[in-house]
């Protein structure tokens, strides 16, 4: 079209200037039709200037130059004496862009596509570009199986040479696969081969991966899956001869036929390595060992190539080339693998840079590095730095990029690109149960205080039965070697009776200081000291409580509830952490083991020890880590020594969102057995079941939890992709199905003495529940929802099916 207009304009010029075919001197240049484009801008785009002598060729070049600006639909150049007259028709300006009928493609994606083609509000409209966009969008719909889709660009003229642009979509329905045929397979059935495809002609209800909707990209992936399936089983000559995709007349059905040649199975006869091995031939040879008579396996060959690259990468060879060429012997059905290695140049690290850490200081990230500047590049050291940054929990994502230094043959820069997450939080917890009602708790925590890496927290609980506050500070790098220093102070006023626990009041306060010593990349030891003061009062006489008091040399009256007791204890605190999780926030792979314990030291009123062991293991079952199995355990044990018992207020409890969901917090395990009250103290409204002997009250059984000195909790969780959540938010939302179990018992309970009551020393009284949980790092903060149904419980257990926590982050 442009060339046609150019030809017409040239002919017009020629016919108007027959007498001037030899050219003329331009004394002036005038424009007609300019509206949006400035005269100066138009003049700058022209090769002709006032005073130039021009001929027909110059005029043709002028027309081409004006068309090339993209601002004009039509250009004519005429001569009026010694004046060059340029007549133009500007392209209309796009005033607005709207979309209608698009469901599969979001508006933002469409706008990005249009802008990439130069179509945006305020720019000139090129109608030829619209045709290309229409075709490109329709091709996209065809690739996802929507063959009846159409896209039409509607241009509505507006005053002042403006237009409204509207893209109207008719997406239609996705064509469904009616049948998939594989022709030429003999070793494996068609059903077996198709079972590994994403595309299916039949999808069982339980298959959440299979899809009958045709997509060109998925078919290409399935063909690669088919190829790998055969190559991994020794079929080195396997070939996909052709693929036919047939569409039904109504464009709603798809028939797929894949023609293959299986060939025979081949065994590996040997591996021969050659090339520039950079002095690491022995290590490389070790990576290429094969078992005699082993079938040829394409995946193992690829892994071998990757392992060689990783090996060389650890020694500074950042860009090695490894190529494997199978040499097939059809006579004896063997394959000899020839591996050519070119290690390339060895690289130094010039600089390590960080991008995206707007809050965190560079020093906080740099101290996690194992790769040093000025040293040989080690790919394993770079990866360790990435792992350590992920485990900090400060970042949503951490990516690395090794960039060559321009002009240098042996230097690179290592760039860590991070996306920070909100590490400060104000947490507000709510629980609701049919028997417990509503409970609240709150806390303020900043894990990366002012970007320094310090962890600062103020946590508290305020409800009907407890007032708790705690201030904690941890410096993870108290020394340059990574020794951490942490401390806390706390105050707790606990009314156990109002918490459906055994009746007593404990007002306590204390502090502790802990040092952490890194042993290696994954192991840390901790040691510290602590002090705690406990002031007990209003202790209603019950067996476990009185047993402890007797061991402490106290002999309170079992008919008196107004007993009081105070202790001051100094403890040696210890711990060990093994952490090989892939990241600190929403891990998907790895294991974390945490051991914490304490023991009283001389100068304490109590003499006891206590320890807990927590483990969590994440096992991904797909390459993208979207489907993950999580196993968690928690074990606890404590006891007294020197003839004393562990204090009852140090007992272990289970139940609640952090242990066994579906049960009210802290209510699993032994229940209080009270001594008979004096008549003046007995409250008939208390939920006691009292036995009588000779007309007098004997011991009274209750539903009040007292905990125990031993605990075991386990959980099996299946983490799945969250439905209806886009990829953009996938890292911020986690859905899981879980099965929790747990038990708490008292090893010092004498069942022979209390034969008419449950045996609270029996660890086999296991509670179980199952349910679903949703975790979301929302703009308002972390939200955790769970719904669990207890399916194994005992008398006195309290259910709390629905639990959730909400918070505010900054």
From Swiss-Prot:
Q: Which residues form the POTRA domain?
A: 24-91, 92-172, 175-263, 266-344, 347-421
Residues annotated as signal peptide: 1-20
Q: Which UniProt keywords apply?
A: Cell outer membrane, Membrane, Repeat, Signal, Transmembrane, Transmembrane beta strand
Q: Which Gene Ontology terms describe the biological processes this protein takes part in? A: Gram-negative-bacterium-type cell outer membrane assembly; protein insertion into membrane
Q: Which residues form a coiled coil?
A: none
One GO cellular component assignment for this chain's record is:
Bam protein complex
* Gene3D superfamilies assigned: membrane protein fhac, membrane protein fhac: a member of the omp85/tpsb transporter family
Q: Which PROSITE patterns match?
A: POTRA
Kindly list the places in or outside the cell where this protein is found, as annotated in its UniProt entry: Cell outer membrane
Name the InterPro entries on file: Bac_surfAg_D15, BamA/TamA_POTRA, D15-like, OM_assembly_BamA, POTRA
Write down the NCBIfam families for this protein, in alphabetical order: OM_YaeT (TIGR03303), PRK11067.1 (NF008287)
Q: How does it assemble?
A: Part of the Bam complex, which is composed of the outer membrane protein BamA, and four lipoproteins BamB, BamC, BamD and BamE.
According to its UniProt entry, the function of this protein is described as: Part of the outer membrane protein assembly complex, which is involved in assembly and insertion of beta-barrel proteins into the outer membrane. Constitutes, with BamD, the core component of the assembly machinery.
The record's family statement is: Belongs to the BamA family.
Protein name as catalogued: Outer membrane protein assembly factor BamA
Q: Which gene encodes it?
A: bamA
């Amino acid at each position: 079209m442009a060339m046609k207009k150019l030809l017409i304009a040239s002919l017009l010029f020629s016919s108007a200037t027959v007498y001037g075919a030899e050219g003329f001197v331009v004394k002036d240049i005038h424009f007609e039709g300019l509206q949006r484009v400035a005269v100066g801008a138009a003049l700058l785009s022209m090769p002709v200037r006032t005073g130039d002598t021009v001929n027909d060729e110059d005029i043709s070049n002028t027309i081409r130059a004006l068309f090339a600006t993209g601002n004009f639909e039509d250009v004519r150049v005429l001569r009026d004496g010694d004046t060059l007259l340029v007549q133009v028709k500007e392209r209309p300006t796009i005033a607005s862009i709207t979309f209608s009928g698009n469901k599969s493609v979001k508006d933002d994606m469409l706008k990005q596509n249009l802008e990439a083609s130069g179509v945006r509000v305020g720019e000139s409209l090129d109608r030829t570009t619209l045709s290309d966009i229409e075709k490109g969008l329709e091709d996209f719909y065809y690739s996802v199986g929507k063959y009846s889709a159409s896209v039409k660009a509607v241009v509505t003229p507006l005053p002042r040479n403006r237009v409204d642009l509207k893209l109207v979509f008719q997406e239609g329905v996705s064509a469904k696969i009616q049948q998939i045929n594989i022709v030429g397979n003999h070793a494996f059935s068609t059903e077996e081969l198709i079972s590994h495809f994403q595309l299916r002609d039949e999808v069982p209800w339980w298959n959440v991966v299979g899809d009958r909707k045709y997509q060109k990209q998925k078919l290409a992936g399935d063909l690669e899956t088919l190829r790998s399936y055969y190559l991994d089983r020794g079929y080195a000559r396997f070939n996909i001869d052709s693929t036919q995709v047939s569409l039904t007349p109504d464009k709603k059905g798809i028939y797929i036929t894949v023609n293959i040649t299986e060939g025979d199975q081949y065994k590996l006869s040997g591996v021969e390595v050659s090339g520039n091995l950079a002095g690491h031939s022995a290590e490389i040879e070790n990576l290429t060992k094969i078992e005699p008579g082993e079938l040829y396996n394409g995946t193992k060959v690829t892994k071998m190539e990757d392992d060689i690259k990783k090996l060389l990468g650890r020694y500074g060879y950042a860009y090695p080339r490894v190529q494997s060429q199978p040499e097939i012997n059809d006579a004896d059905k063997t394959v000899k693998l020839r591996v050519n290695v070119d290690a390339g140049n060895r690289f130094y690290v010039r600089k390590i840079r960080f991008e995206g850490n707007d809050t965190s200081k560079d020093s906080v990230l740099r101290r996690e590095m194992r790769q040093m500047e000025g040293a040989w590049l080690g790919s394993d050291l770079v990866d360790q730095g990435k792992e350590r940054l992920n485990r900090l929990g400060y970042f949503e994502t951490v990516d690395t990029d090794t960039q060559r230094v321009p002009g240098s043959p042996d230097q690179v820069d290592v760039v860590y690109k991070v996306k920070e997450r909100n590490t400060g939080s104000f947490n507000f917890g709510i629980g609701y149960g049919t028997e417990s009602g509503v409970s609240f708790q709150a806390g303020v925590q900043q894990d990366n205080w002012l970007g320094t890496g310090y962890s600062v927290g103020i946590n508290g609980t305020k409800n009907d039965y407890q007032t708790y506050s705690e201030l904690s500070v941890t410096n993870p790098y108290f020394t340059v070697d990574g020794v951490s220093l942490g401390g806390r102070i706390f105050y707790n006023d606990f009314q156990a009776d109002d918490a459906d626990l055994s009746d007593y009041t404990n007002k306590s306060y204390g502090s502790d200081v802990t040092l952490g010593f890194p042993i290696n990349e994954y192991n840390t030891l901790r040691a510290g000291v602590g002090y705690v003061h406990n002031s007990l009062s209003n202790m209603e006489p019950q067996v476990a409580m009185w047993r402890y008091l007797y061991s402490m040399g106290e002999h309170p009256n079992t008919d008196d509830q107004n007993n009081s007791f105070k202790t001051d204890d100094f403890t040696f605190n210890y711990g060990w952490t093994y952490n090989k999780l892939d990241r600190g926030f929403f891990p998907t792979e790895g294991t974390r083991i945490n051991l914490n314990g304490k023991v009283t030291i001389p100068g304490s009123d109590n003499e006891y020890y206590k320890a807990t062991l927590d483990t969590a293991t994440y096992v991904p079952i797909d390459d993208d880590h979207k489907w993950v199995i999580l196993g968690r355990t928690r074990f606890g044990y404590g006891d007294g020594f020197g003839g004393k018992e562990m204090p009852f207020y140090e007992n272990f409890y289970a139940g609640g969102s952090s242990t066994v969901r579906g049960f009210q917090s802290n209510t699993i395990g032994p229940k209080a057995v009270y001594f008979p009250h004096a008549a003046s103290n007995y409250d008939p409204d208390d939920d006691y079941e009292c036995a009588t002997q000779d007309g007098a009250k004997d011991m009274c059984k209750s539903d009040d939890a007292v905990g125990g000195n031993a605990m075991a909790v386990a959980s099996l969780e299946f983490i799945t992709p969250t439905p209806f959540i886009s990829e953009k938010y996938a890292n911020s939302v986690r859905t899981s199905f879980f099965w929790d179990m747990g038990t708490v018992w008292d090893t010092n309970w004498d069942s022979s003495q209390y034969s008419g009551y449950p045996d609270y020393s029996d660890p086999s009284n296991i509670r179980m529940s199952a349910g679903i949980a949703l975790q979301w790092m929302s703009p308002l903060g972390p939200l955790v929802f769970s719904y669990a149904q207890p399916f194994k419980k005992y008398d006195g257990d309290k259910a709390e099916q629905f639990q959730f926590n909400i918070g505010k982050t900054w």
